[in-house]
Amino acid sequence: MAISCPGWVMPVTVSLEPSKPIRLLSILGTRPEATKMAPVVRILSADGRFQHALVVTAQHREMLDQVMGLFQLKADFDLDIMRNRQSLSQITSRSLTGLDRVMEQTKPDLVLVHGDTTTTLAGALSAYYHQIPVAHV
């Protein structure tokens, strides 16, 4: 099976072997992202056709943790990027550095991001750098 995604910059085709699970990586960082993506993450994690991993940047740690607990979500990777008084550039840089390691380790077929946050930007950019298609919810 092949999934063809007409990308904004260039078209992308992902070839998938039907006998192997599709490797998906969902990236979250804020409470609204986790709230809206929780049902999707739970379904993908329970479906044997997918090998799903969840990475959080914890851009909004306390609020994110509340929602993760409420929906019983567990991150496979926690980048824990936040530091006192850091700029958006520093948040982006720390996210990209952490996501680079996760992308190398998990080698996803598709990356899922949500919304319009710094985490979303970093997740999509990291996937692009690794030539991995992005699905934006």
Regions found by a protein language model. Give the residues of each.
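N-terminal subdomain of nucleotide-sugar transferases
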Residues: 8-58
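Aromatic-residue detector
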Residues: 14, 42, 54, 60-61, ...
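Structured loop/turn residues at beta-strand edges in well-structured enzyme cores
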Residues: 22, 74, 106
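Active-site and donor-binding regions of nucleotide-sugar-utilizing enzymes
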Residues: 25-28, 33-43, 67, 81-137
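Conserved nucleotide-sugar phosphate-binding/catalytic loop shared by glycosyltransferases and other
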Residues: 48-94, 98
